[in-house]
Structure formats: structure tokens, C-alpha cells
Amino acid sequence: KVDGISQKVLGEQGIPPVSTVTDPDYRATGFLIDGKGYLVTNAHVVNRLKTIFVENNKGEDFRAVPVYTDNNTDLAILKITDESFKAIPALPYSIRRNNLDLAEPIFTLGFPRNEIVYGEGYLSAKSGNSGDSTAYQVTVSVNPGNSGGPVMNRNGEIVGIITSKEKNADGVVYAAKSANIFKLLDAVKKSEDSLSIKLPSGSGLKGMERTQQVKKMEEYVFMVLGN
């Protein structure tokens, strides 16, 4: 969907991450939306992978499978299936339902390298490419591998998900709005009654210094690997 003439997806091909996964040929980012092992990433990432692993900030790899994908918003839900994964009781952040204000500061975490990378910027437009109302335009430095990474505001709320960037315009990046996650779950419930995903509602990052927010968030942002 986002491989248009003026855009490119932000997954990274052909770069071998440091991982126990055998010869992965693609790398992106995802983050937990439920401590039982449910993550959000991009649909364009999931669609090109037959085998998917996710890696946490401790270097632990876990097998994951797609639960649901929505190509219209370029979002997908993954489920960690490895028995070695230990559920996390409570995530310290929440997912924002409402839109951001223009010029609101944001930051993102992702895996353009073999270690997590921080970037900061601001909301530059309330819509995405060609007026897409399901996305934002943000000004922030991202690189291949950032695709699927969380966009957060100063209160530590998830406000978006990195999807693509303009090839010929430095710093012009698009992010799916976090409200799409709620719509995604509604669709999942209609198709998979047995799934129980509880979105986080924590406020543990609010009021923290940015360095402390990032330290806490690192545990919940994963590298997405696969072939």
C-alpha cells in the first residue's frame, strides 16, 4: 500500500540483525498492546514475511504469528506463540483515542539498527499523504527499520505508528493514527470471537523526564525479524 512513487516503506531488507534467528532478511519494529504477547506493527511488514520472530531489548527471540492485518491503515496485530515468553502484568502506557494538535511534540523508538534508536519531532499535519484522514504527517528522523514503531507524546501515550516516509523530502514521515488500533480490535472481535486483547490504560509514564520514559518503554518495543 505505501510503496508509492513518492513514498517508501521503512522496513529494512538485506541487513542481517544481531539475532539467534537464522539469516533473517527483513527487520522492522513492533510494540506490545497487551502483556499476553500481542503486538502492533505494519501490515506491509507482515505481508512479506512467511516466518516471523520478535526480539526484545534483552536479545531474546520469540516466534510470532499474524492475528489480523488491515492494509487500508497498514496495521497488523502479531501474537507471540513461544511458551518461553512471560506475560507482562501491566503496560505503563495508554493508547490515545483522540487526535493530536498541530505542532505537538512527539518521539519514537525503533530498530533502524541492531539496537533501539530514539527520535524526536513534532506533528506537522493532521492528515497523512494526499489528505489521508487515518494518518498524521510528522517531522522526525526515521530510517529503514523504523516501520511499525510507536509514536508517543509527552505524556507517554501511544499516538501513532510509523508507516512510511517521503523519498524526496527530508524528515517528512507518515504515521497511522493510534485510534486505528481500536478499530482494528473491533474487526478482530467480529472475526475471532475467542481472542481476548485488552489494550493498556496505564499512566505510568506521565510526568516523567524523557530519559526515564524511554528507559521504561524499551522493554515493550520489539525488533520484528523474518524471512
Language model segments and positions:
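C-terminal cap/linker of serine protease catalytic domains
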Residues: 1-18, 84-87, 158-227
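A conserved glycine-rich beta-strand in the N-terminal activation segment of trypsin-fold
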Residues: 16-38, 42, 60-63, 90, ...
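Small-residue-enriched segments and motifs
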Residues: 30, 52, 62-65, 121, ...
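A residue-level detector for short acidic-glycine micro-motifs
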Residues: 34, 66-68, 110, 125-126, ...
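Conserved active-site neighborhood of the chymotrypsin/trypsin-like protease fold
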Residues: 35-117, 132-135, 144, 191-207
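Short beta->alpha transition motifs characteristic of CBS
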Residues: 42-47, 110, 119, 144, ...
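Short, compositionally biased
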Residues: 119-130, 174
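Catalytic nucleophile loop of clan PA
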Residues: 142-162
